[in-house]
C-alpha cells in the first residue's frame, strides 16, 4: 500500500 499525505 502507498499512503501520501500532503499538507
Curated annotation (Swiss-Prot):
List locations, semicolon-separated: Secreted
* A single GO BP: sexual reproduction
Keyword annotations from UniProtKB, A to Z:
Neuropeptide, Secreted
Its tissue distribution reads: Vitellogenic follicle, fully grown oocyte, egg and internal egg-capsule (at protein level). Not detected in previtellogenic follicles, external egg-capsule, central nervous system and hemolymph.
One term under GO cellular component:
extracellular region
Q: Which domain of life is it from?
A: Eukaryota
Function, please? Has myotropic activity targeting the genital tract.
Task: State what protein this is by name.
Answer: Ovarian jelly-peptide 1
